[in-house]
C-alpha cells in the first residue's frame, strides 16, 4: 500500500468549495431576474395594446365630431356664411378621420395578437384592458436600493466568483513553481518453494519517503505563468471595480428616474384634463361661430397629444417600476425580496 501526498500543490477542491456555491446561488437569482424581465416585457406589450386602444377611441371620437362639423359647414355653405375652401378642408379632415379609424383598428388587432401570443391566450378569449392609473405609493432611497441590489442581485455574486477564480489561477501558478511529494508505503515480503508458503508469516516492510521534484531549468516558464496569473488578477479586479461603479450608476439613474416619473404622471394627467376642457370650450365657441375650424383643429390636436402623453407617462412609470424590481430583486411596494424562501 502506498500513499503519495503532494506538498504545496494547488488544491482545486478547496477552490471549488468556494466558487461553486456562488455559481449555484447566482443561477437561482438569475431566474428571479428573468421573471422580472418577463414582467417588464409584458408591461410593454400591455401598453402597446393600451395605446392602440386609446388611439382607436380617439380616432372614433374624432370621426364622429368631424362628421358633425362637416354637416354644420355644409349648412353654413348653403346659406353663404362659409366658403367652399373651408367646406373642402372639413371634408378632407373627415376623410382622414375615416382613414385614422381604419389604421387604428388594424394596429389594435396587431398589438392584441402579439399580447395574446406572449401570455398564451387563444383567439376565442376576449379581453378589454383597463388603464392602470393607480400608482403604488412608496419611497425608494438610493442607499436602500443599493443595499438591496448588493444583497440580492446575481451580478454581485458574480463579482465575488470572478475574484475567486482569478485568485485560484494565481494559487495554481504558485503551486507549479515548487513541487514536493510526501510518500508513505507499507507492504509484506516473503519467499518460499511453493505458492502457499509465501503467505506463511511474511516479513513486514514499512517505508516512509519524502521526495522533491524541482526542475533544474524551466527557462522561466513557471515564473512567467505566475506573473501572467497575477496580472490577470489585477486586471480582473480593475474590471470588477468598474462594473460595480457602472451598476451602481445604473441604480442611481433608475431611482432618480422613478421619482421623476411620478411627477410626470401628475403633470400629464393635469394637462390631459386641461386640454380636454379647452377642446370642449373651443367646440362650443365654434358651434356659435366665435372661432374658425383652424383653431378648433388646434384644440383637437392638443387634446389628443395630451392624452397620448399621459398614456406614455404611465407606460414609462410601470416599465421603470419593473426595472427597479429587476435591478434590486426587491418588491418595495410589499417590502419583500423577490427570490428565496422569505
Regions picked out by a protein language model, each given a short descriptive name:
Residues 1-9, 30, 40, 121, ...:
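A small-residue-enriched
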Residues 7, 15, 21, 123-164, ...:
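Bacterial Sec-pathway N-terminal export signals of envelope proteins
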Residues 29-148, 257, 261, 302-303, ...:
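Periplasmic alpha-helical coiled-coil/stalk elements that build and connect Gram-negative outer-membrane
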Residues 34, 38-59, 75, 93, ...:
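Amphipathic alpha-helical coiled-coil segments
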Residues 104, 154, 236, 313:
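Metallo-beta-lactamase
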Amino acid at each position: 500500500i502506498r500513499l503519495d501526498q503532494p506538498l504545496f500543490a494547488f488544491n482545486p477542491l478547496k477552490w471549488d468549495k468556494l466558487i461553486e456555491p456562488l455559481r449555484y446561488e447566482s443561477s437561482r437569482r438569475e431566474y428571479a431576474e428573468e421573471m422580472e424581465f418577463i414582467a417588464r416585457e409584458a408591461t410593454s406589450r400591455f401598453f402597446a395594446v393600451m395605446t392602440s386602444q386609446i388611439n382607436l377611441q380617439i380616432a372614433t371620437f374624432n370621426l364622429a365630431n368631424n362628421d358633425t362639423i362637416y354637416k354644420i359647414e355644409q349648412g353654413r355653405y348653403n346659406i353663404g356664411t362659409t366658403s367652399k375652401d373651408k367646406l373642402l378642408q372639413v371634408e378632407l379632415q373627415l376623410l382622414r378621420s375615416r382613414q385614422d379609424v381604419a389604421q387604428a383598428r388594424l394596429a389594435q388587432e396587431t398589438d392584441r395578437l402579439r399580447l395574446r401570443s406572449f401570455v398564451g391566450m387563444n383567439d376565442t378569449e376576449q379581453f378589454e384592458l383597463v388603464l392602470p392609473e393607480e400608482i403604488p405609493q412608496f419611497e425608494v432611497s438610493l442607499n436602500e436600493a443599493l443595499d438591496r441590489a448588493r444583497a440580492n442581485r446575481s451580478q454581485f455574486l458574480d463579482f465575488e466568483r470572478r475574484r475567486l477564480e482569478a485568485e485560484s489561477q494565481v494559487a495554481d501558478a504558485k503551486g507549479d513553481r515548487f513541487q514536493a511529494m510526501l510518500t508513505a508505503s507499507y507492504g509484506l515480503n516473503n519467499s518460499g518453494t511453493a505458492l502457499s508458503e509465501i503467505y506463511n508469516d511474511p516479513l513486514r516492510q514499512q517505508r516512509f519517503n519524502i521526495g522533491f521534484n524541482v526542475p533544474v531549468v524551466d527557462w522561466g516558464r513557471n515564473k512567467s505563468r505566475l506573473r501572467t496569473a497575477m496580472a490577470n488578477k489585477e486586471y480582473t479586479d480593475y474590471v470588477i471595480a468598474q462594473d460595480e461603479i457602472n451598476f451602481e450608476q445604473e441604480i442611481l439613474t433608475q431611482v432618480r428616474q422613478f421619482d421623476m416619473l411620478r411627477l410626470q404622471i401628475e403633470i400629464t394627467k393635469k394637462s390631459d384634463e386641461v386640454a380636454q376642457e379647452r377642446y370642449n370650450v373651443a367646440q362650443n365657441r365654434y358651434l356659435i361661430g366665435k372661432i374658425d375650424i383652424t383653431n378648433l383643429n388646434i384644440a383637437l390636436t392638443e387634446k389628443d397629444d395630451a392624452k397620448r402623453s399621459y398614456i406614455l407617462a404611465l407606460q414609462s412609470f410601470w416599465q421603470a417600476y419593473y426595472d427597479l424590481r429587476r435591478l434590486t430583486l426587491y418588491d418595495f411596494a410589499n417590502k419583500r425580496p423577490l427570490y428565496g424562501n422569505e
